[in-house]
Amino acid sequence: MRNFLCLSLALAAGAAHADAPAAAAAAVAPPGLQASQLAIVINDAEPNSVEVGEYYRKAHGIPAANVAHVNIPNRPRKLSIDQFAQLKERINAQLKPEIQAVLMVWSAPYAVECNAITAAFTLGYDGDQCAKTCDPGKPSKYFNSEAAQPYTQLGLRLSMLLPVDFVEEAKAVVDRGAVSGFSVPAASAYYLTTSDAVRNSRAGFFPPAGVVRQRKLTVKNLKADSLEGAQDIMVYQTGQAKVAKLDTLHFLPGALADHLTSFGGDLQGSSQMSSQRWLEAGATASYGTVSEPCSYWQKFPNPTVLLRRYLSGSTALEAYWGSVLWPAQGLFIGDPLAAPYAGFRR
């Protein structure tokens, strides 16, 4: 408990040292990411991207002017540095200055060399990380940030990817994200310490068990390799190469779920469970690394920070991005605008 309290105080103190212009901007800006500030990037070479992109726009009431179009044939898993530079230039040329975040509507590409495409887009390509993927990463300016307008205040356009391999599954993710803010359900956040010691590196950051009454949320810490039969999941974080019994679970709209493993972000890989399986099981957003990160907790969502941000009313995009200290290899997927606790945002 002492470690948890010390961590919380340290993070809060770090967030308090925002510069004066940033604080002033936050004071006059809308609280948090708005639909009008999100751009949707559609791959015109992929029919699923076109269909799901338009579905997303209508579901969240995003202006048609916020839609950017690119053409990426053949669904490559990975882009070279030059290919990515050209893609990013095409996207940025279509974005208005007030755009704070971007949703890429496709399943692939999802990597730029060893970087995840979302990290490369938001932070810029990190070649040093690719020299040795098991080295420590570079800190993100957005980690635990209270910046309400990340592009305006920090020069960072947060990004997420919505996989579209199966149109109906992608639309189901969108539906869950769109309804997530309508009411606050009674829910649970599950944190599993598994028998896989290497993949338990962030277990020390699991929030303590208890009840957050205002949010109707119960925090549960379990020593188990999998969760079975839970029907009230808002958060599920664990450490396993493959997570069993997902078909027995029910995720509530807006649920976040991820597993600490090497290749969760390798959406087309088969050696470990893809983070996309979480979305298929009913989660609304997830995270995974696209290249071998080694088990640094800093390369994965910090459970304490993630929960605090989400319960404070952040969107899934803001909560997930703000919870990863070294995100170069990490792919953020799902519906960025999901925000089941938006009513609590100040």
Model-derived regions, located:
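N-terminal signal peptide c-region/cleavage motif recognized by signal peptidases
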Residues: 13-17
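Cysteine-dependent hydrolase recognition
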Residues: 19-346
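Sec-dependent N-terminal signal peptides
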Residues: 4-12
